[in-house]
Each structure stands twice: as structure tokens, then as C-alpha cells.
Swiss-Prot record:
Belongs to the EMP24/GP25L family. The lineage of its organism: Eukaryota, Metazoa, Chordata, Craniata, Vertebrata. Residues 1-142 are annotated as: Required for interaction with STX17. A motif (COPII vesicle coat-binding) lies at residues 211-212. Ectopic expression of TMED10 alone does not result in its proper cis-Golgi network localization. Interaction of TMED10 with TMED2 is both necessary and sufficient for transport of the couple to the cis-Golgi network, and TMED3 and/or TMED9 contribute to facilitating the process. Predominantly dimeric and to a lesser extent monomeric in the ER. Monomer and dimer in ERGIC and cis-Golgi network. Forms homooligomer (via GOLD domain); the assembly is promoted by direct binding with leaderless cargos and may form a protein channel that facilitates cargo entry into the ERGIC. Forms heterooligomeric complexes with other members of the p24 family such as TMED2, TMED7 and TMED9. This is Transmembrane emp24 domain-containing protein 10. A motif (COPI vesicle coat-binding) lies at residues 211-219. Residues 41-193 form the GOLD domain. Glycans are attached at N179. It comes from Oryctolagus cuniculus (Rabbit).
């Protein structure tokens, strides 16, 4: 990122900049490392919006020295099980795909081997949306000046924020519709239960009346 100079630098980031970081910073970048034992499977899941570019880089450190025929399989799927990326005997590489729908995506690493083998160290760096775009490459292809590149980045950032707000509004409307539907069902069920209780109470009154008449306890 380009640095600020002058009075703005002393004042620190403004509310709008903090909002950008809050909305896009944590959600568009996933950088994680973990240990993967032999003959085990670990998966990471993340919800990603529709029509977003997703890029990633991974590196798997093999500390076994090739012993035990250790192999690691990397597979990326959506909630329907469609394979977006797959790599047998993965060690180091990159991947990229574009989402077609808002969905939950799963990145799985599976290790297979024999014998006592040290755990593998897996490093995964995954980005999507604005963070996934290579603006240096875009600048070269479109012959953009540095200022134009920053303007393009801000334009994409603004569009992403607008899409996030639109999605949150849509989810809010869906949740409100669900709540209204649930309240309506609860109301109907309450009315039905009330009529059932009234009917049961009426039946009990007539039944007891006939019973007492049969026993000649009442006329």
C-alpha cells in the first residue's frame, strides 16, 4: 500500500478506512498454517460471494525425507461436491477459480503413508475479491499509470463494499420473511391448539354428564 504523508499521517486512519479494513480485510484473505499427521484429513471451510475470483498458494513441507511413501492430496469443492481444484501428491503450487454462486467452499488436505512419519507443515494463503486481483499485471496489460491503478483498486473496493451491503440487506429481508412466516405458523398453531382444547373440554363435559346420569348421580 502507498503511504500517506502530511497531516493525514499524524491523524491515523479515518472511520471510512477502518470500515474498509473491517469489511474486506478479515473476510477476503485466509492465511493459515497447521500440522497434518500421516493418514489424516483436515479441511477448511469458507463462505464466498458469487462471481468472485479466488486465488491461493499452498506449500507442504515434507519432513519424512520421502520415507513411507508419503503423499498428500489437495482438493477444493463446493457444497454440492463439485471439484474446483484437485492435486495428487501436492507439495507446492497455486490455484485459481471464479465462484458461480454464493456458497460454502471446502479446502481439504489428506495425507497418506505408512510407518511413523513426522507431521507435515501445511501453509495456505487464499484470497478472494479485490485482494485476489493482480493489479500489477492489470497495469501492464492496460498500460495504466500508478494513480490509475490506485483508482481502479478503490473502484473495485467500493463495488465490493456495495455488494456486501446489498447481500446483508438481502439476508436481512430473508430473515425477516422467515420470522414473519414463523410467527404466522405459531399463531395458526396456537389457534388450532385452542380449538382442540375447547373441543376436548366440551367432550369431557358431555362424557361426564352421561357417566353421572348412568350412575344416577344427576338427573
Amino acid at each position: 500500500m502507498s503511504g500517506w504523508s502530511g497531516p493525514l499521517a499524524r491523524r491515523g486512519p479515518g472511520p471510512l478506512a477502518l470500515l474498509f479494513l473491517f469489511l474486506l480485510g478479515p473476510s477476503s484473505v485466509l492465511a493459515i498454517s497447521f500440522h497434518l499427521p500421516v493418514n489424516s484429513r483436515k479441511c477448511l471451510r469458507e463462505e464466498i460471494h458469487k462471481d468472485l475470483l479466488v486465488t491461493g498458494a499452498y506449500e507442504i513441507t515434507d519432513q519424512s525425507g520421502g520415507a513411507g511413501g508419503l503423499r498428500t492430496h489437495l482438493k477444493i469443492t463446493d457444497s454440492a461436491g463439485h471439484i474446483l481444484y484437485s492435486k495428487e501428491d501436492a507439495s507446492k503450487g497455486k490455484f485459481a477459480f471464479t465462484t458461480e454462486d454464493y456458497d460454502m467452499f471446502e479446502v481439504c488436505f489428506e495425507s497418506k503413508g505408512t510407518g511413523r512419519i513426522p507431521d507435515q507443515l501445511v501453509i495456505l494463503d487464499m484470497k478472494h475479491g479485490v485482494e485476489a486481483k493482480n493489479y500489477e499485471e492489470i497495469a501492464k496489460v492496460e498500460k495504466l499509470k500508478p494513480l490509475e491503478v490506485e483508482l481502479r483498486r478503490l473502484e473495485d473496493l467500493s463495488e465490493s463494499i456495495v455488494n456486501d451491503f446489498a447481500y446483508m440487506k438481502k439476508r436481512e429481508e430473508e430473515m425477516r420473511d422467515t420470522n414473519e412466516s414463523t410467527n404466522t405458523r405459531v399463531l395458526y398453531f396456537s389457534i388450532f391448539s385452542m380449538f382442540c382444547l375447547i373441543g376436548l373440554a366440551t367432550w369431557q363435559v358431555f362424557y361426564l354428564r352421561r357417566f353421572f346420569k348412568a350412575k344416577k348421580l344427576i338427573e
